[in-house]
Amino acid sequence: MRESLGVSLPSRPLLLKLGLLSLPWALCAGLHAVGLGVWLVLALGWFASLAMLVLLLRAPRQAVANANPQADAASPAWSAAQRALADETAQLDGHARQIDELLHSAIRQLSDSFHGLAERIDTQRGLSHSLIERYDGRGQVDEGINFQDFVRTTQQTLSLFVEATLETSRTSQQLVERMDQVRLKITEILQSTQDMDAIAKQTNLLALNAAIEAARAGESGRGFAVVADEVRALSTRSTEFSAAIRKHVDVVHHEIQDAESAISQLADKDMSFALDSKHKIQGMLDDLEAMNRHTLKVIHELDRLSLEVGQGVDAAVTALQFQDMGSQLLGQMRKHHARLGAFALGLGALEARPRQEWPERVAREVEELRRPLPSPVSQNSVNVGEVELF
């Protein structure tokens, strides 16, 4: 059939080998589809392909030993296999470098973002601590006074004001009592002026009687009549003077009554106003104290949340170190790629060697390929294990 069509198709063993080599990559594609990381999928695919290639290349020694003259006459295309392997390893190495660059760029941006977030959280915690020190009164404040000192100073000032007002009210009460005593004294003075009026009237009456008697005496009573006139004049002046005193004392008496009433009202008003103001201000200070306690509670809660967020950021920054492990694993993959490339070069060089040397050289290349390389990462999680630092 192949001769009739004029087309040279691959042999069945070659198709079987190609199918076996593509099987690991198909499995890795399925793992990537379910969410496995691309760099881990590439590593698994490469190691699986390498193992499959080693298994397929175990046969050359036995095949050469049992080959018939017709098989020896056919020369394998080692250079073509070498070029195919070299192209494949170059593509794998390019993908590994691309993954490394993408990881490095993304992790650097994430790390910078987390470090900036950590700095802002530290600033927020510092502000919270300054508010706590200012509101709870336990810390030293560089400028001004804290809230507790403000409340305490306000209470002391208001207490002094209330005490001064109460003392003024008490003094006003004492002044009212003194004014009452003065009012009583003025009442007595008014009573005395009335007595003086009565005396003046009696004196005037006596002077009038004396003048009458002097007129009856005639010439001998003339001198006595003069004295009687003077006594009457003195009595009149005493009456006028007593009236003037009574008038002034009445004015003073009314003024003192008005002053006593005003002082009494002021004392009562100051007392009630001071007590009422004291109660209201004490209620306001109690409300401020309750508000202060609530504010402190909220600030403490914010400080606790900031601490937890900071710890989460630190844990995230620590977890970002997986980029170092990924880079080292990708570097390890490039080493294996280089060994695979050297193995391909060795296969390509077999064309220039006698066929009798092929089994030995292939076995030597396979042995070199099987030689293990030290792994820089000995863990499968970022939480445990060690990483070889660059």
Swiss-Prot record:
InterPro entries: Chemotax_Me-accpt_rcpt (IPR004090), MCPsignal_dom (IPR004089). It comes from the Bacteria. GO terms for biological process: chemotaxis; signal transduction. Gene3D superfamilies: Methyl-accepting chemotaxis protein. Residues 173-265 form the Methyl-accepting transducer domain. One of its GO terms (molecular function) is transmembrane signaling receptor activity. Disruption phenotype: Mutants have general chemotaxis defects in media that are low in magnesium. This is Methyl-accepting chemotaxis protein McpA. It comes from Pseudomonas aeruginosa (strain ATCC 15692 / DSM 22644 / CIP 104116 / JCM 14847 / LMG 12228 / 1C / PRS 101 / PAO1).
